Amino acid sequence: MRYLTAGESHGQALTAIIEGIPAGLALSAELINKELKRRQGGYGRGARMRIESDRVHISSGVRHGKTTGAPITLTIQNKDHQKWLDIMAVEAVEEQIKFKRKITRPRPGHADLVGGIKYRFDDLRNALERSSARETAMRVAVGAIAKAILTELGIETANHVLVFGGIEVAVPEAMSFADIKKVAESSDLSIVNPKQEATIKAHIDQVKKEGDTLGGIIETLIHGLPAGLGSYVQWDRKLDAKIAQAVLSINAFKGVEFGMGFDMGYQKGSQVMDDIIWHETSGYSRRTNRLGGFEAGMTTGQPIVVKGVMKPIPTLYKPLMSVDTETHEPYKATVERSDPTALPAAGVVMENVVATVITKEILEQFPSDNMTDLKQAFFAYRDYVHHF
């Protein structure tokens, strides 16, 4: 499985071509649209979420509600593009139009300046448009297809926010995967403790008034994987490493950890490793899951627990200082439309990105020309693991 995305924030559309999806998977635009709607929700989102109501168009690779095994083409139109027809025109335009929304005062924390240097842009908008988090809408659409495959295999995914703008969410002890998923998805903050919602929303509102932004820490959970996905035989085949790369590829994500994560650096080995146990009906398991479902780059059969830290959105309504790239004079940075926080949406993106990596690994490890062969091989392997 592989895919490419294309498109700009204010361009005509986002596009993806996905190759390697098995034939025979039940797939509809509505299934993908439900996931896109999750991404557009969440407290603290701005005006664009009211402009855009993302809906995907499938133009290849699906016939009569089932995938054919051919490349799948997805398109999401940018409704906001109607206001940018001249500025984002493909064909050459007059000079006064060309520089109508020209950007020469890069925003700290964004791709503006470094992208302009690398690609020799005199208008930094070219870097801004492609590097925008708008692209994550298509990554969620791709993830929705990946999750459809995982669902067929009995694998579930969830995400929730652990730290919201410096406020730690008190996760109830021994909360089940099912409860985490249910409560987080019903919360417009994606948290599992409703008692903290008022406090966090007040914090978001205050930060918005200040023209500032908030980041946080998101946890993604994958439930139902067997032991043995990934490999230790080469560095680039370790599945946790692939997930880490994917998480860090999400806009504004600056760190990733599994299980106890960096807290392991403060503990002894006896307080970190997970005791191995065995039961005649379920086979091998672990008494705890401090390592987050991985050993030596392979799944252990425990739930995958991966955390990602998202920096505060760098576009500030009270901008930091910058330098004009034409005059080299100090100026306040450019202000583009932004949100005080996008943590709930980022959680949906992270969940789908991780799901895509895991699905790709499964499709590489098992026969995957069609769903019948994939399911037969996967369930046979799961049975083998239970009886090892």
From Swiss-Prot:
Keyword Transit peptide: no
EC number(s) from the headed UniProt entry: 4.2.3.5
GO MF annotations, alphabetized: chorismate synthase activity; FMN binding
Binding site for FMN: R130, S131, S132, N251, A252, A296, K311, P312, I313, P314, T315, R337
The entry's keywords: Amino-acid biosynthesis, Aromatic amino acid biosynthesis, FAD, Flavoprotein, FMN, Lyase, NADP
InterPro entries for this protein: Chorismate_synth, Chorismate_synth_AroC_sf, Chorismate_synthase_CS
SUPFAM superfamilies: Chorismate synthase, AroC
Gene3D superfamilies: Chorismate synthase AroC (3.60.150.10)
Enzyme class, spelled out: lyase
Domain of life: Bacteria
A GO CC term assigned to this protein in UniProt: cytosol
Names of required cofactors: FMNH2
Keyword Acetylation: no
PROSITE patterns for the chain: CHORISMATE_SYNTHASE_1, CHORISMATE_SYNTHASE_2, CHORISMATE_SYNTHASE_3
Residues that hold NADP(+) according to the record: R39, R45
Catalytic activity: 5-O-(1-carboxyvinyl)-3-phosphoshikimate = chorismate + phosphate
Function: This reaction introduces a second double bond into the aromatic ring system.
Family classification: Belongs to the chorismate synthase family.
Subunit structure: Homotetramer.
Name listed for the protein in its UniProt record: Chorismate synthase
